[in-house]
Amino acid sequence: MLYLLSELSGTLTPLNVFRYITFRTGGALFTAGFFVFWFGPWIISLLRLRQGKGQPIREDGPASHLTKRGTPTMGGLMILAGAVVSILLWTNPHNHYVWVTLAVTLGFGAIGFYDDYLKVTKQSHKGFSGRFRLLLEFAIAGAACLMISLYSPAGLQNQLAFPVLKDTLLNLGWFWVPFAAFVIVGAGNAVNITDGLDGLAIVPVMIACATFGIIAYLVGNVIYAGYLQVNYVRDTGELAVVCGAVIGAGLGFLWFNAPPAQIFMGDTGSLALGGLLGSIAVAAKHEIVLAIVGGLFVLEIMSVIIQVVSFKLTGKRVFRMAPIHHHFEQKGWKEPQVVIRFWIIAVILALVGLATLKLR
């Protein structure tokens, strides 16, 4: 919305600053952060009042988690509210990628909200049918990928780019849409699986958002894309503003989610944020790089898959408990140790992901 003020720069020159993506990214970050920080206590009080017992805690989990009983969930509403308000305020309203990303984020957020609602009202870890949930996620992601394909440059439609390999594209044809949808759905559920300890998911999400904000900005700038010899995808630079808004909202949320957490983001937040990361990676043609930058999320969801498959085939478990962050807790690591060490891993993976831009 504020971007439109730049159209008056001919009359009032200082308004030209609203054309700059970097300026609006900073504005989006501070706006979202202030929104969540200011309204956070009120939202937490309201959710605590409405939910009563809060998020159900696993009885088979680490004993230290039992002290978290009564903590409200659905904190993703705080993140989404702050991010969406900021995105609408600071992005170019004519940018198609912004609207597609918002649609995925809010769609996944709605699915997560309903799942959280069922868990809280039933005081059970089981939300609604996993198959139906996946069906809804793929429907939303598939529609988004069709739109992204239409908006992509002619030479990049349905193409999969490979990091490090210069000018190497794989034409997936009709298979690109289901592949890209899988990336988005996979990202959403991987972040969802990771959200099991105070602060564990939100910081890696912010790190990944910062990384993909940089990638989207560079890929969407014809000069930088040419210098780095990466595929130029027009208009994706605006997604850096979206990433800035999410980082700001994440910082505001972390203020209340820092241990001991006053609120959990729940599926409302984790599904939405993962879907957002996936859609940005797909739009920027850096799907494979997402697996590197979001390697922590990949590790978490793969630990669950390995555990389930191993138990069904052999009757034995590979990990003491899945997801893998609980495995380390069962080995004696304190919760802050697990969280901070996983943050360090996320930072390292983000740097590796950024390095792929230059290594050609």
Swiss-Prot record:
GO terms for molecular function: metal ion binding; phospho-N-acetylmuramoyl-pentapeptide-transferase activity; UDP-N-acetylmuramoyl-L-alanyl-D-glutamyl-meso-2,6-diaminopimelyl-D-alanyl-D-alanine:undecaprenyl-phosphate transferase activity. It is a multi-pass membrane protein. The chain crosses the membrane at residues 27-47, 70-90, 98-118, 134-154, 168-188, 199-219, 239-259, 263-283, 288-308, 337-357. Keywords: Cell cycle, Cell division, Cell inner membrane, Cell membrane, Cell shape, Cell wall biogenesis/degradation, Magnesium, Membrane, Metal-binding, Peptidoglycan synthesis, Transferase, Transmembrane, Transmembrane helix. GO terms for biological process: cell division; cell wall organization; peptidoglycan biosynthetic process; regulation of cell shape. Coiled coil: none annotated. CDD domains: GT_MraY. GO terms for cellular component: plasma membrane. Its cofactor is Mg(2+). Catalyzes the initial step of the lipid cycle reactions in the biosynthesis of the cell wall peptidoglycan: transfers peptidoglycan precursor phospho-MurNAc-pentapeptide from UDP-MurNAc-pentapeptide onto the lipid carrier undecaprenyl phosphate, yielding undecaprenyl-pyrophosphoryl-MurNAc-pentapeptide, known as lipid I. Belongs to the glycosyltransferase 4 family. MraY subfamily. This is Phospho-N-acetylmuramoyl-pentapeptide-transferase. It comes from Methylorubrum extorquens (strain CM4 / NCIMB 13688) (Methylobacterium extorquens). The lineage of its organism: Bacteria, Pseudomonadati, Pseudomonadota, Alphaproteobacteria, Hyphomicrobiales.
